[in-house]
Amino acid sequence: EEAADAAWEVMELGVYSLYQDGYAKLFTEAAEHSSESIFNVEAVANPLGLGHSTDIVMRQYNSAAPLRNFIDSYWMKDGKPREESAYADSEGYADLDPRFAQTIVYPGSTWMGETVKTDNTNVRFTNKQTGFIYKKYTVYTAKVPGDQELNLGENCSPTNIMLLRYADI
């Protein structure tokens, strides 16, 4: 009851609201300090290029790859766990919660103009550890129509990391 009361107090402040421009865009530099962001870790540029390393996953190292148990924790698009879902026999990732495809690059998906392969022959990134890569907080820009290319070096993403969102309340 105490937690519910505290959540209600935050909602009644009228300061925060859900981000309306799409889940995937919420985790980009453009949406920093949006009305959904309650508490975040501020990314600060410095001459040493130090920062958080979420953008490194799109390069050769892929050191922050999501583990299989994280992938398997996504519920199905009907809002139920796989074993209770009408999509229980579904193979692949199409019937998972739509936030999955906006958060994770997975085998068979298209990213940076290429179909992600399971054999690690993609030129622009590898997925050697788990076969999956994070999209969230990854910085990229479209330099040519249909072609997305990273615009930052490793360990220097300028994107803040949201620790508490209004949706969490």
What are these regions (language model features)?
Residues 1-124:
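An aromatic- and glycine-enriched ligand-binding surface/loop that stacks and positions planar moieties
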Residues 88-166:
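Flexible, polar/acidic helix-loop-strand segments at domain edges
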